[in-house]
Swiss-Prot record:
Family matches, as HAMAP family: PSRP
SS bond partners: none
Name used for this protein in its record: Phosphoenolpyruvate synthase regulatory protein
Biological role stated in the UniProt entry: Bifunctional serine/threonine kinase and phosphorylase involved in the regulation of the phosphoenolpyruvate synthase (PEPS) by catalyzing its phosphorylation/dephosphorylation.
Species of the source: Escherichia coli O6:K15:H31 (strain 536 / UPEC)
Binding-site list for ADP: 157-164
PANTHER family: PYRUVATE, PHOSPHATE DIKINASE REGULATORY PROTEIN 1, CHLOROPLASTIC
Pfam families, per database record: Kinase-PPPase
InterPro entries registered for this protein in UniProt: Kinase-pyrophosphorylase, PSRP
Classification lineage: Bacteria, Pseudomonadati, Pseudomonadota, Gammaproteobacteria, Enterobacterales
Family: Belongs to the pyruvate, phosphate/water dikinase regulatory protein family. PSRP subfamily.
Gene: ppsR
Amino acid sequence: MDNAVDRHVFYISDGTAITAEVLGHAVMSQFPVTISSITLPFVENESRARAVKDQIDAIYHQTGVRPLVFYSIVLPEIRAIILRSEGFCQDIVQALVAPLQQEMKLDPTPIAHRTHGLNPNNLNKYDARIAAIDYTLAHDDGISLRNLDQAQVILLGVSRCGKTPTSLYLAMQFGIRAANYPFIADDMDNLVLPASLKPLQHKLFGLTIDPERLAAIREERRENSRYASLRQCRMEVAEVEALYRKNQIPWINSTNYSVEEIATKILDIMGLSRRMY
């Protein structure tokens, strides 16, 4: 086995494998191990299932260690093939379904692609999410100030503090119309809240970042530039944080948080509804 890898982990599904990945990652994060992840979506027929089984078995014979397999598969004949592999297999959905079945005294009716597939019941929600993504892309980095009143949240911050990835995550994961507005170096001599944003202050949310981290990120983009200098980063961060305090704009430091954590904190602080898809 590669010395840098403790375990190989498979996420397998007859659908997108998103559920298997999310739950599997959550479980594996509890253990101090380095993993090599393999995601295999749309395992929908026996031929594909046998190929997956062979892949699992090959890693076992190569390393001598059982791969960990998190799977979500509806058809029993497909599940049976995966279960015959040399992997340590965990049915992530059935582990929750069985006790719920007993509690609710109802038999489940498994349907492939129900979790992330389109159907007449969720088509409107899907269309709303696509509209949110379109809106967010059109209002990224201050590209357009038109229709800002339609935003559910407007993220503020210096360049490279995480505004764009957070906005896109909010749109894609939760269907939130998220605009973002950058404060650039030229703004810093007299930093004030732009007139176009003042009527929308209840929608504003600020991001900040440790200057050292900001300098490192900017250095990768513009090496040895004033833009990436620690002095410049310290000045910009200090000015922006002062603006947040003066205008009573809620804000968080993004340095030690993932995009998922930042987005969730924004939803919580701003009281925005979580719309899962």
